[in-house]
Amino acid sequence: MPTAHQELGVFGEQKVVQKCACPKCKRSRTLVRLPTNFKCADVICDFCGYLGQVKAARVKDITKIPKAVLGAAWKPQKERMDAAIYFPLFLVLASENLKQHAIYYLAADLQKPELFRPRSPLSKNARRAGWQGFIYETDQARNSFVRLF
């Protein structure tokens, strides 16, 4: 049974593939979801191979980007950053009941290391002890996001 956060993630990915054209080749309906737990990417264009990350958050006002959004695993993100590889970000903001949503886009070339803040590793008593995630400090790039829908 998926958690509320997992359901929100699927919701965000579904909205991106339903509504967004590929930012690289500009074709409609070519973005498809990648398998769950694919590292650092959630969608791929089945025409040109473009990869993108999707993050979703519940907010009170879908017109305002929150100051921070939960990311994913820190280690693979850090390894890619060290290699100067960044994936474009689709940020899906949804109302509490998911009736309203907005999709924002942040291009890879507008991302800087300051956008990513590592979280503290999970405690030794946690189910996934030692796992470390990160937070997108969206305040660092607020003016670079473009609203698509």
Label every model-predicted segment.
Residues M1-L51, K55-F149:
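Nucleic-acid endonuclease domains
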